[in-house]
Amino acid sequence: MFARKNIPNQLTMLRLVFAAAFFGVLQLYRYQAEPASPVWVLPVATVLFILAAITDALDGYLARRWEVVSKFGRIMDPFCDKILILGAVIYLGSPRFLDPVAVADGSFRTMVSGVYPWMVVLVLARELLVTGIRGEVEKAGIDFSANWIGKLKMILQSVVVPVVLVVVMIDPNRDPGNGYAWLGWVRDVLVYATVIATVLSGLPYVTGGIRAFKRLKPEPEGSA
């Protein structure tokens, strides 16, 4: 029973290890760099991210199934999620995925990842806002668990990152006549859908936080 109790938390911490390895591998990549980045970088990064995402699906499921949900898990699980996802978004929106040819041509599609700095700002802002609201509300003893759209957001984020990396590997922009140009549009649709879902998933937390703060607001002195 002791070993079973610790497996979900061990999976959570394993996700942090996978995330660190994922960032370390991506640190070796730069689009159209001279000399070229090692060919194994993006495939290995993709596998590491998928493994990290699998641990995210497993740790919560096993904790609930075995009824071993812990305070450690409630804190570290979302923390590791944010490290993995936010780190991935920051890397994908960084100059490492900037297309110098598109920049020189004055194209508006300058990121081979399809992730732009303004998207990174929106995702970071959403996470910071929700984390702040949740911290204040749960400090008062009110449950503020993830809602269904928040879970959908996490699924989309977990899918879009490996898809983006695979599209960058295929690189439909390098040769528009290679028949893979449609992959760029698939990437863009998924990226924009994920950004929209990320922003919208924060709205229930904002409205729920406002209602919770109103309930927690102390009554004026002398009121009945």
Q: Which residues fall in each region the model found?
A:
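Core segments of transmembrane alpha-helices
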Residues: 14-22, 78-92, 128-131, 153-165
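Membrane-water interface at transmembrane helix exits
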Residues: 64, 90-93, 134, 138, ...
